[in-house]
Amino acid sequence: MNVRLLKNMNMRLTGIYNYSDGFRENVSQNIMDSNKREEAFSRMKLSYNPNNRLSILATRIYAELKNGYDAWAPDNNTDFKTFSKDKGEDSQRTFGYSLRANFEARENLNITSISSFTETDLVHAYDGDWADSAYYSKIHGWNYTNLGEDYYPIYSVHRNEKNRANLTQEVRMSAGPIILGGYYKHLKEQDIAFDNNGWLIGGATDGNSHYNFQATAGYAQYGVDLTPSLKLKANFRYEKNSIIYDGSSIGLNDYLEKIFLAPISFDIDHAMIGYRTSLHYLKDKFTSFYGSVSQGYKSGGVNQQPFLSDASRPYEPEFIRNFEIGLKRAAHKYRTQFSAFYSQRNNQQVSVSSQQDKENPNSFLFYTGNAGSGTIQGFEWENTLNVSSNLNMDASLGYLTTWVDKFTYFAAEGVEAIGGDREAAMSPKMTGSVGFNYENESGIFASALMSFKDEYYFSDSHDQQSEPYSLLSLTLGKSFRKTTATIWIRNAMDERYTTRGFYFGLIPPDYPDQLWKSYGDPRQIGVTIDYTF
């Protein structure tokens, strides 16, 4: 909704609310919304233009997510039935503010300032063994209560609460083809994790940590027309990060008595350089070619798991050098673009898993490490064809090959394992889609989209893979003067496809390692009505 407040002041309000029951039936709790998604978002923008040289934009956002978390089952069933005895939670509340000011000091000289602040509270909680004692007794003949009253509560609900405050400030100046700027970020995060009766992560019952991250960066960009058809653009960025981490936790000894674990502190500094140089050639008004060489980076950090060794806690920045070429063409009947790329990853970051205690599912944890070098290469193609004045066809194809060099990590306390020497995790080799869009003069429209994703490794620390799958989405609707009504179907073929996969021991009494799957949403049918006023 747009509202004019004063002569030079306008306000825009946006609000969104989404609800879904999460497509899970919890048999143990006899409820249908244990995995619900209830999300509300609002945004207010206030623009003020006192004169032709100064513009100010203030923004306020509010987001509240009251989501459940119940996505896993100890039988890996595809019927979306779960057996957890405790309610999971994946909630978030965020307040955010930003102020952007642009001042035209003189012709071809602009100064821009962007300030922002956000504060977020997050809660993540889940049932540690994913089921109640009745399930394990009936399905596996295993009854925790036979082991004594102190044993079963060990695998109770895990809960992690975070408070995150983030302040950023950016100032940049543009003078013709030159841009100079500076950037500052200060992130503070406090984590409180606890378990009602027992093991938390790797054997801790309570954890408390403070994470203080500061980033300071300067950047520059220069663009020049070498010829009327050939343009050169180059940019450079230098960034320095400072990380201070303090963590404390309480664990259990052999007699299940709480003991204080040794506190952990880190004070780390990292410096990183990024750059990009590109050439853009305009062949004619329909066709252009480009090529670029660039280096990007990903900041380092500290793992907060209390039972990791000191050597495994910090991880270094990753640097990636990219080479890319491509073309774009926009003709009357079609639009197409193609790009091919090759990337070298140095000191690459990988997410590995570790189960500190074979007989404790809550001791399964993820942490980030560095894996030496690796490569990424492939191509992407997108095309839109105007079949007729009412019908067009969209198609896309992606091909990706990756490689991670061999690396070592700790799979359990004192147990070193080897990973890598294969493709990277979460990197399907082939992806693609084909879609049709129809709309006539009377406002009737329809679309069909079929997408495909190839198999991929779930993690860098085990060799379990997903299955390839295809999804079909359909829409049918009609537009009126101010109203649009749409009937839609997502995952029309009701495909069961996995989105995440973990590999660890969960089932007593022997706790063999198994692949545990989480599935994407089933078929959904709905109606959407849009009204413009």
Give, region by region, the residue ranges found by the protein language model.
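Transmembrane beta-strands of outer-membrane beta-barrel pores
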Residues: Y17-D21, Y62-K66, F117-D121, Y184-K188, ...
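Gram-negative outer-membrane beta-barrel transporters
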Residues: D225-L232, K240, Y342-Q344, Y367-D460, ...
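C-terminal beta-signal and adjacent terminal beta-strands/loops
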Residues: N346, S451-S459, K478-F533
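Structural signature of Gram-negative outer-membrane beta-barrels, strongest in the C-terminal barrel
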Residues: S47-R53, I61, M173-A175, Y183-K185, ...
